[in-house]
Amino acid sequence: MDSLSSSTTTASAQRCLFVTLGCAKNEVDTDRMRSLLIDAGYGVADDVDSADVVLINTCSFLASATSESIDTTLDLADEVSAGVRKKPIVMCGCVPSRYGDDLDEQLPEVAAFVKADEEDGIVAVVDSVLGNAGREGRADLTGTLRTIEGTSAFVKISEGCDRFCAFCAIPYIRGRYKSREEQEILDEVSSLMEGGVREIVLIGQDTGIWGSDFGDGRNLAYLLRGVAEVVRPYDGWVRVLYLQPEGMTDELVGVIRDVPEVLPYIDIPIQHCCERVLKSMGRSGSEEQLRQLFARLRSEIPGMVLRTTGLVGFPGETEEEFEALLDFFKEQEFDYMSVFPYSREDGTKAATMEEQVPEDVKMDRAQRLLDVAEELGFSATAKHVGERVKVIIDGVDDSDDGVELIGHTWFQAPDCDGAVHIESGEATVGDVVTVDLVDSFCYELVGEIVDGE
Protein backbone atom coordinates (compact mmCIF):
# COMPACT_ATOMS: atom_id res chain seq x y z
CA MET A 1 0.00 0.00 0.00
CA ASP A 2 1.28 3.47 -0.86
CA SER A 3 2.54 5.72 1.89
CA LEU A 4 0.60 8.83 2.87
CA SER A 5 2.93 11.05 0.91
CA SER A 6 6.45 10.81 -0.38
CA SER A 7 9.24 13.34 -0.30
CA THR A 8 9.24 13.50 -4.08
CA THR A 9 5.58 14.42 -4.37
CA THR A 10 5.01 18.15 -4.79
CA ALA A 11 1.97 20.00 -3.48
CA SER A 12 1.05 21.02 -7.02
CA ALA A 13 0.47 17.32 -7.80
CA GLN A 14 -1.68 16.74 -4.73
CA ARG A 15 -5.42 17.19 -4.89
CA CYS A 16 -8.12 17.98 -2.35
CA LEU A 17 -11.67 16.64 -2.39
CA PHE A 18 -14.22 19.02 -0.85
CA VAL A 19 -17.51 17.80 0.63
CA THR A 20 -19.89 20.45 1.97
CA LEU A 21 -22.92 19.92 4.18
CA GLY A 22 -25.41 22.45 5.48
CA CYS A 23 -26.33 25.96 4.45
CA ALA A 24 -25.11 28.49 1.91
CA LYS A 25 -22.82 30.01 4.53
CA ASN A 26 -20.92 26.72 4.62
CA GLU A 27 -20.68 26.77 0.83
CA VAL A 28 -18.99 30.16 1.09
CA ASP A 29 -16.56 28.87 3.72
CA THR A 30 -15.69 25.86 1.57
CA ASP A 31 -15.16 28.14 -1.39
CA ARG A 32 -12.70 30.23 0.58
CA MET A 33 -10.76 27.17 1.78
CA ARG A 34 -10.68 25.82 -1.77
CA SER A 35 -9.35 29.14 -3.04
CA LEU A 36 -6.67 29.26 -0.34
CA LEU A 37 -5.51 25.76 -1.21
CA ILE A 38 -5.53 26.42 -4.95
CA ASP A 39 -3.55 29.61 -4.34
CA ALA A 40 -1.08 27.54 -2.32
CA GLY A 41 -0.56 25.13 -5.21
CA TYR A 42 -2.99 22.31 -4.49
CA GLY A 43 -5.41 20.90 -7.03
CA VAL A 44 -9.08 19.93 -6.74
CA ALA A 45 -10.23 16.30 -6.95
CA ASP A 46 -13.57 15.10 -8.27
CA ASP A 47 -13.79 11.95 -6.15
CA VAL A 48 -12.11 10.05 -3.33
CA ASP A 49 -10.02 7.89 -5.67
CA SER A 50 -8.30 10.89 -7.26
CA ALA A 51 -7.86 12.82 -4.00
CA ASP A 52 -4.82 13.00 -1.75
CA VAL A 53 -6.79 14.53 1.11
CA VAL A 54 -10.51 14.75 1.85
CA LEU A 55 -11.98 17.86 3.49
CA ILE A 56 -15.53 17.76 4.82
CA ASN A 57 -17.16 21.03 5.90
CA THR A 58 -19.77 20.05 8.47
CA CYS A 59 -23.06 21.40 9.80
CA SER A 60 -24.18 21.21 13.42
CA PHE A 61 -27.20 23.53 13.43
CA LEU A 62 -29.51 20.64 14.33
CA ALA A 63 -28.91 17.25 15.89
CA SER A 64 -29.91 15.67 12.58
CA ALA A 65 -27.31 17.79 10.77
CA THR A 66 -24.64 16.71 13.25
CA SER A 67 -25.57 13.07 12.69
CA GLU A 68 -25.43 13.54 8.93
CA SER A 69 -22.00 15.16 9.23
CA ILE A 70 -20.61 12.32 11.32
CA ASP A 71 -22.22 9.63 9.17
CA THR A 72 -20.85 11.23 6.01
CA THR A 73 -17.39 11.42 7.58
CA LEU A 74 -17.51 7.73 8.51
CA ASP A 75 -18.76 6.82 5.03
CA LEU A 76 -15.84 8.74 3.53
CA ALA A 77 -13.48 6.94 5.91
CA ASP A 78 -14.84 3.59 4.72
CA GLU A 79 -14.40 4.67 1.12
CA VAL A 80 -10.85 5.81 1.80
CA SER A 81 -9.93 2.58 3.62
CA ALA A 82 -11.27 0.53 0.72
CA GLY A 83 -8.88 2.24 -1.68
CA VAL A 84 -5.35 1.27 -2.60
CA ARG A 85 -3.82 4.34 -0.97
CA LYS A 86 -4.27 5.91 2.45
CA LYS A 87 -5.36 9.53 2.51
CA PRO A 88 -6.20 11.77 5.46
CA ILE A 89 -9.61 13.23 6.26
CA VAL A 90 -9.90 16.78 7.62
CA MET A 91 -13.17 17.72 9.35
CA CYS A 92 -13.96 21.44 9.19
CA GLY A 93 -16.67 23.84 10.30
CA CYS A 94 -19.49 23.62 12.78
CA VAL A 95 -19.05 20.15 14.25
CA PRO A 96 -15.45 20.83 15.38
CA SER A 97 -16.53 24.26 16.63
CA ARG A 98 -19.36 22.80 18.68
CA TYR A 99 -17.74 19.66 20.07
CA GLY A 100 -14.05 20.57 20.09
CA ASP A 101 -11.60 18.21 21.74
CA ASP A 102 -14.26 15.55 22.35
CA LEU A 103 -13.94 14.55 18.70
CA ASP A 104 -10.35 13.33 18.95
CA GLU A 105 -11.34 10.13 20.71
CA GLN A 106 -14.75 9.76 19.05
CA LEU A 107 -13.48 10.05 15.48
CA PRO A 108 -10.01 8.51 15.21
CA GLU A 109 -10.63 8.22 11.45
CA VAL A 110 -10.12 12.01 11.15
CA ALA A 111 -6.56 13.32 10.82
CA ALA A 112 -7.30 16.92 11.79
CA PHE A 113 -10.13 19.16 12.95
CA VAL A 114 -10.56 22.78 11.84
CA LYS A 115 -13.06 24.99 13.63
CA ALA A 116 -15.17 27.50 11.71
CA ASP A 117 -13.08 30.44 12.88
CA GLU A 118 -9.81 28.69 12.01
CA GLU A 119 -10.45 28.03 8.33
CA ASP A 120 -7.97 30.64 7.11
CA GLY A 121 -5.32 28.27 8.45
CA ILE A 122 -6.44 25.40 6.23
CA VAL A 123 -3.26 25.43 4.12
CA ALA A 124 -1.05 24.77 7.14
CA VAL A 125 -3.36 21.95 8.23
CA VAL A 126 -3.33 20.27 4.82
CA ASP A 127 0.43 20.76 4.58
CA SER A 128 0.77 19.00 7.92
CA VAL A 129 -1.45 16.00 7.24
CA LEU A 130 0.22 15.47 3.86
CA GLY A 131 3.73 15.86 5.22
CA ASN A 132 4.36 19.12 3.40
CA ALA A 133 4.96 21.29 6.48
CA GLY A 134 7.58 23.97 5.93
CA ARG A 135 7.28 24.00 2.16
CA GLU A 136 7.29 27.23 0.19
CA GLY A 137 4.29 28.62 -1.65
CA ARG A 138 2.02 29.79 1.14
CA ALA A 139 -1.41 31.21 0.38
CA ASP A 140 -1.90 34.97 0.21
CA LEU A 141 -4.67 36.04 2.59
CA THR A 142 -4.79 39.64 1.40
CA GLY A 143 -6.62 39.13 -1.89
CA THR A 144 -10.19 38.24 -2.70
CA LEU A 145 -10.28 34.48 -2.40
CA ARG A 146 -13.24 32.88 -4.14
CA THR A 147 -13.59 30.36 -6.90
CA ILE A 148 -16.35 31.15 -9.38
CA GLU A 149 -18.82 28.40 -10.17
CA GLY A 150 -22.26 29.29 -11.48
CA THR A 151 -24.14 32.47 -12.20
CA SER A 152 -25.03 33.40 -8.60
CA ALA A 153 -22.70 33.77 -5.64
CA PHE A 154 -23.41 33.90 -1.92
CA VAL A 155 -21.39 36.54 -0.10
CA LYS A 156 -21.18 36.52 3.70
CA ILE A 157 -21.45 39.97 5.24
CA SER A 158 -21.14 38.87 8.87
CA GLU A 159 -20.26 36.01 11.14
CA GLY A 160 -21.87 34.79 14.35
CA CYS A 161 -25.03 35.95 16.10
CA ASP A 162 -25.94 37.89 19.25
CA ARG A 163 -29.61 36.90 19.45
CA PHE A 164 -29.21 33.70 21.47
CA CYS A 165 -32.66 32.43 20.52
CA ALA A 166 -33.60 29.66 22.94
CA PHE A 167 -33.73 26.99 20.21
CA CYS A 168 -30.55 27.91 18.34
CA ALA A 169 -26.95 26.77 18.84
CA ILE A 170 -25.40 29.13 16.28
CA PRO A 171 -23.98 31.66 18.80
CA TYR A 172 -22.22 28.78 20.57
CA ILE A 173 -20.89 27.42 17.29
CA ARG A 174 -20.05 30.58 15.38
CA GLY A 175 -19.55 33.05 18.21
CA ARG A 176 -20.80 36.59 18.73
CA TYR A 177 -21.94 38.79 15.87
CA LYS A 178 -19.23 40.47 13.82
CA SER A 179 -19.81 42.52 10.69
CA ARG A 180 -17.45 41.93 7.83
CA GLU A 181 -15.56 45.00 6.67
CA GLU A 182 -17.26 46.96 3.90
CA GLN A 183 -14.29 47.16 1.54
CA GLU A 184 -13.61 43.45 1.83
CA ILE A 185 -17.21 42.75 0.82
CA LEU A 186 -17.11 45.19 -2.10
CA ASP A 187 -13.80 43.79 -3.35
CA GLU A 188 -15.20 40.27 -3.28
CA VAL A 189 -18.35 41.34 -5.12
CA SER A 190 -16.26 43.12 -7.75
CA SER A 191 -14.10 40.04 -8.28
CA LEU A 192 -17.14 37.81 -8.62
CA MET A 193 -18.83 40.10 -11.13
CA GLU A 194 -15.64 40.34 -13.18
CA GLY A 195 -15.60 36.54 -13.21
CA GLY A 196 -19.04 36.30 -14.78
CA VAL A 197 -21.39 36.10 -11.79
CA ARG A 198 -24.79 37.68 -12.47
CA GLU A 199 -26.33 37.77 -9.00
CA ILE A 200 -24.93 38.49 -5.56
CA VAL A 201 -26.80 37.00 -2.59
CA LEU A 202 -25.85 38.62 0.72
CA ILE A 203 -26.08 36.25 3.67
CA GLY A 204 -25.34 36.12 7.40
CA GLN A 205 -27.10 34.98 10.54
CA ASP A 206 -28.72 38.41 10.92
CA THR A 207 -28.05 40.53 7.85
CA GLY A 208 -30.26 43.42 8.92
CA ILE A 209 -27.90 44.55 11.68
CA TRP A 210 -24.77 44.69 9.52
CA GLY A 211 -22.57 47.58 10.66
CA SER A 212 -24.14 47.92 14.10
CA ASP A 213 -20.86 46.87 15.72
CA PHE A 214 -18.84 49.49 13.83
CA GLY A 215 -20.32 52.37 15.80
CA ASP A 216 -20.07 54.87 12.93
CA GLY A 217 -23.59 54.82 11.49
CA ARG A 218 -22.96 52.42 8.62
CA ASN A 219 -25.83 49.98 8.15
CA LEU A 220 -27.24 47.45 5.69
CA ALA A 221 -28.94 50.14 3.60
CA TYR A 222 -25.58 51.86 3.22
CA LEU A 223 -23.88 48.60 2.26
CA LEU A 224 -26.57 47.75 -0.28
CA ARG A 225 -26.04 51.07 -2.04
CA GLY A 226 -22.35 50.27 -2.30
CA VAL A 227 -22.89 46.74 -3.59
CA ALA A 228 -25.44 48.05 -6.09
CA GLU A 229 -22.85 50.46 -7.48
CA VAL A 230 -20.42 47.58 -7.98
CA VAL A 231 -22.88 45.31 -9.83
CA ARG A 232 -24.49 48.12 -11.87
CA PRO A 233 -22.00 48.09 -14.80
CA TYR A 234 -22.67 44.36 -15.19
CA ASP A 235 -26.48 44.68 -15.03
CA GLY A 236 -26.22 42.49 -11.94
CA TRP A 237 -28.75 41.69 -9.24
CA VAL A 238 -28.42 41.93 -5.46
CA ARG A 239 -30.53 39.82 -3.11
CA VAL A 240 -30.54 39.78 0.71
CA LEU A 241 -31.45 36.76 2.84
CA TYR A 242 -31.91 36.23 6.59
CA LEU A 243 -33.42 39.55 7.63
CA GLN A 244 -35.21 39.93 10.96
CA PRO A 245 -38.40 41.94 11.62
CA GLU A 246 -36.55 44.48 13.77
CA GLY A 247 -34.10 45.16 10.95
CA MET A 248 -36.71 46.38 8.46
CA THR A 249 -36.05 50.10 8.92
CA ASP A 250 -37.59 52.79 6.73
CA GLU A 251 -34.18 53.42 5.18
CA LEU A 252 -33.68 49.76 4.27
CA VAL A 253 -37.19 49.48 2.84
CA GLY A 254 -36.48 52.57 0.75
CA VAL A 255 -33.31 51.07 -0.69
CA ILE A 256 -35.06 47.82 -1.59
CA ARG A 257 -37.85 49.82 -3.22
CA ASP A 258 -35.79 52.46 -5.02
CA VAL A 259 -32.44 50.90 -6.01
CA PRO A 260 -33.03 48.90 -9.21
CA GLU A 261 -30.22 46.41 -8.63
CA VAL A 262 -31.61 45.39 -5.22
CA LEU A 263 -34.36 42.83 -5.78
CA PRO A 264 -37.73 43.35 -4.05
CA TYR A 265 -37.40 39.93 -2.45
CA ILE A 266 -37.57 39.92 1.34
CA ASP A 267 -36.67 36.92 3.48
CA ILE A 268 -37.81 37.29 7.10
CA PRO A 269 -37.81 34.06 9.14
CA ILE A 270 -40.48 34.86 11.75
CA GLN A 271 -40.47 31.34 13.33
CA HIS A 272 -43.84 31.95 15.02
CA CYS A 273 -46.54 34.59 15.40
CA CYS A 274 -47.78 34.08 18.97
CA GLU A 275 -46.29 36.56 21.42
CA ARG A 276 -45.99 34.02 24.25
CA VAL A 277 -44.15 31.53 22.05
CA LEU A 278 -41.89 34.22 20.61
CA LYS A 279 -41.02 35.45 24.09
CA SER A 280 -40.25 31.90 25.20
CA MET A 281 -38.02 31.56 22.14
CA GLY A 282 -36.12 34.68 23.20
CA ARG A 283 -37.53 36.65 20.29
CA SER A 284 -39.56 39.84 20.27
CA GLY A 285 -42.78 40.84 18.56
CA SER A 286 -46.39 39.75 18.37
CA GLU A 287 -48.88 38.63 15.78
CA GLU A 288 -50.24 42.15 15.38
CA GLN A 289 -46.77 43.66 15.02
CA LEU A 290 -45.89 41.12 12.34
CA ARG A 291 -49.19 41.79 10.59
CA GLN A 292 -48.44 45.52 10.56
CA LEU A 293 -44.90 44.91 9.30
CA PHE A 294 -46.01 42.83 6.33
CA ALA A 295 -48.79 45.29 5.51
CA ARG A 296 -46.24 48.11 5.50
CA LEU A 297 -43.83 46.19 3.28
CA ARG A 298 -46.53 45.29 0.77
CA SER A 299 -47.75 48.88 0.72
CA GLU A 300 -44.32 50.46 0.27
CA ILE A 301 -42.88 47.84 -2.11
CA PRO A 302 -45.69 46.89 -4.51
CA GLY A 303 -45.22 43.49 -6.12
CA MET A 304 -42.57 42.37 -3.65
CA VAL A 305 -42.04 38.70 -2.81
CA LEU A 306 -41.96 37.43 0.78
CA ARG A 307 -40.21 34.35 2.14
CA THR A 308 -40.45 33.22 5.76
CA THR A 309 -39.82 30.30 8.10
CA GLY A 310 -42.09 28.60 10.62
CA LEU A 311 -40.84 26.61 13.61
CA VAL A 312 -43.41 24.27 15.16
CA GLY A 313 -43.45 22.13 18.29
CA PHE A 314 -41.36 24.51 20.40
CA PRO A 315 -41.57 23.55 24.10
CA GLY A 316 -44.93 24.56 25.52
CA GLU A 317 -46.55 25.29 22.15
CA THR A 318 -50.24 24.46 22.50
CA GLU A 319 -52.55 23.23 19.78
CA GLU A 320 -54.27 26.62 19.86
CA GLU A 321 -50.95 28.43 19.35
CA PHE A 322 -50.08 26.14 16.48
CA GLU A 323 -53.50 26.77 14.91
CA ALA A 324 -52.83 30.50 15.24
CA LEU A 325 -49.58 30.09 13.30
CA LEU A 326 -51.39 28.01 10.69
CA ASP A 327 -54.05 30.71 10.31
CA PHE A 328 -51.40 33.45 10.14
CA PHE A 329 -49.63 31.70 7.28
CA LYS A 330 -52.94 31.35 5.43
CA GLU A 331 -53.80 34.99 6.05
CA GLN A 332 -50.45 36.37 4.92
CA GLU A 333 -50.15 34.17 1.81
CA PHE A 334 -46.36 34.16 1.82
CA ASP A 335 -44.76 33.35 -1.52
CA TYR A 336 -42.24 30.91 -0.06
CA MET A 337 -42.21 29.24 3.34
CA SER A 338 -39.79 26.86 5.02
CA VAL A 339 -41.12 24.68 7.84
CA PHE A 340 -39.12 23.02 10.60
CA PRO A 341 -40.10 20.91 13.60
CA TYR A 342 -38.33 22.02 16.76
CA SER A 343 -35.12 20.10 17.45
CA ARG A 344 -33.88 19.75 21.03
CA GLU A 345 -30.27 20.96 20.85
CA ASP A 346 -27.77 20.36 23.64
CA GLY A 347 -26.52 23.54 25.24
CA THR A 348 -29.50 25.69 24.26
CA LYS A 349 -31.96 27.19 26.71
CA ALA A 350 -34.91 25.38 25.15
CA ALA A 351 -33.30 21.98 25.66
CA THR A 352 -33.89 22.25 29.41
CA MET A 353 -37.42 23.62 29.19
CA GLU A 354 -40.32 21.62 30.52
CA GLU A 355 -43.34 20.78 28.38
CA GLN A 356 -41.34 19.32 25.52
CA VAL A 357 -43.78 18.55 22.71
CA PRO A 358 -43.94 14.83 21.79
CA GLU A 359 -42.10 13.93 18.60
CA ASP A 360 -45.20 12.62 16.82
CA VAL A 361 -47.08 15.84 17.59
CA LYS A 362 -44.19 17.95 16.29
CA MET A 363 -44.00 16.00 13.05
CA ASP A 364 -47.77 16.15 12.58
CA ARG A 365 -47.79 19.92 13.05
CA ALA A 366 -44.84 20.34 10.70
CA GLN A 367 -46.62 18.35 7.99
CA ARG A 368 -49.85 20.31 8.42
CA LEU A 369 -48.01 23.62 8.15
CA LEU A 370 -45.97 22.35 5.21
CA ASP A 371 -49.19 21.37 3.41
CA VAL A 372 -50.43 24.95 3.79
CA ALA A 373 -47.05 26.35 2.75
CA GLU A 374 -47.00 24.27 -0.42
CA GLU A 375 -50.59 25.11 -1.32
CA LEU A 376 -49.90 28.82 -0.95
CA GLY A 377 -46.49 28.60 -2.62
CA PHE A 378 -47.77 26.70 -5.64
CA SER A 379 -50.57 29.25 -6.01
CA ALA A 380 -48.14 32.17 -5.72
CA THR A 381 -45.93 30.62 -8.40
CA ALA A 382 -48.88 30.09 -10.75
CA LYS A 383 -49.81 33.77 -10.46
CA HIS A 384 -46.62 34.67 -12.34
CA VAL A 385 -47.81 32.85 -15.47
CA GLY A 386 -48.38 35.47 -18.16
CA GLU A 387 -45.58 37.74 -16.98
CA ARG A 388 -42.56 38.74 -19.06
CA VAL A 389 -39.39 38.62 -16.95
CA LYS A 390 -35.62 38.61 -17.14
CA VAL A 391 -34.11 35.18 -16.51
CA ILE A 392 -30.51 34.29 -15.71
CA ILE A 393 -29.55 31.07 -17.50
CA ASP A 394 -27.98 28.81 -14.88
CA GLY A 395 -27.53 25.54 -16.74
CA VAL A 396 -28.68 23.00 -19.29
CA ASP A 397 -30.72 19.88 -18.51
CA ASP A 398 -30.52 17.06 -21.04
CA SER A 399 -31.62 14.26 -18.72
CA ASP A 400 -35.07 13.90 -20.27
CA ASP A 401 -36.18 13.82 -23.88
CA GLY A 402 -34.68 16.84 -25.58
CA VAL A 403 -32.69 19.64 -24.00
CA GLU A 404 -33.96 22.49 -21.87
CA LEU A 405 -32.36 25.55 -20.38
CA ILE A 406 -32.68 26.08 -16.63
CA GLY A 407 -32.65 29.54 -15.11
CA HIS A 408 -34.14 31.70 -12.40
CA THR A 409 -35.77 35.09 -12.28
CA TRP A 410 -35.87 37.87 -9.69
CA PHE A 411 -38.45 36.25 -7.41
CA GLN A 412 -36.57 32.93 -7.17
CA ALA A 413 -33.62 32.75 -4.79
CA PRO A 414 -30.99 30.40 -6.24
CA ASP A 415 -30.99 26.83 -4.91
CA CYS A 416 -34.10 27.64 -2.93
CA ASP A 417 -37.28 28.67 -4.73
CA GLY A 418 -37.64 26.65 -7.90
CA ALA A 419 -36.53 27.52 -11.42
CA VAL A 420 -37.62 28.59 -14.88
CA HIS A 421 -37.54 25.81 -17.49
CA ILE A 422 -37.08 26.89 -21.12
CA GLU A 423 -37.66 24.19 -23.72
CA SER A 424 -36.92 26.21 -26.86
CA GLY A 425 -34.68 29.09 -27.83
CA GLU A 426 -30.95 29.62 -27.76
CA ALA A 427 -28.87 30.93 -24.88
CA THR A 428 -25.74 30.02 -22.97
CA VAL A 429 -25.06 29.77 -19.26
CA GLY A 430 -24.67 33.25 -17.82
CA ASP A 431 -26.91 34.95 -20.37
CA VAL A 432 -29.76 37.12 -19.15
CA VAL A 433 -32.72 36.64 -21.47
CA THR A 434 -36.27 37.96 -21.69
CA VAL A 435 -38.79 35.19 -21.11
CA ASP A 436 -42.56 34.87 -21.28
CA LEU A 437 -43.81 32.64 -18.45
CA VAL A 438 -46.39 30.29 -19.96
CA ASP A 439 -47.01 27.55 -17.38
CA SER A 440 -46.20 26.40 -13.84
CA PHE A 441 -45.94 23.20 -11.84
CA CYS A 442 -45.33 23.19 -8.09
CA TYR A 443 -42.66 25.87 -7.52
CA GLU A 444 -41.39 25.58 -11.11
CA LEU A 445 -42.21 27.78 -14.10
CA VAL A 446 -42.08 27.13 -17.83
CA GLY A 447 -40.98 29.93 -20.12
CA GLU A 448 -40.30 30.85 -23.72
CA ILE A 449 -37.47 33.13 -24.79
CA VAL A 450 -38.68 36.32 -26.45
CA ASP A 451 -36.75 36.74 -29.69
CA GLY A 452 -35.09 40.06 -30.31
CA GLU A 453 -34.94 41.15 -26.67
Give the label of every model feature segment.
Residues 1-210, 251, 262, 266, ...:
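Proteins enriched for Cys/Gly/acidic motifs involved in redox and nucleic-acid/cofactor modification
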Residues 21, 164, 168-175, 237-246, ...:
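Conserved strand-turn element in the central/C-terminal portion of the radical SAM core barrel
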Residues 352-453:
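Terminal RNA-binding accessory module
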Residues 194, 221-235, 249-308:
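Radical SAM/AdoMet-radical enzyme domain recognition
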Residues 60-65, 197-230, 243-251, 278, ...:
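Conserved glycine-rich "GG(E/T)P / GGGxP" loop and the immediately following alpha-helix
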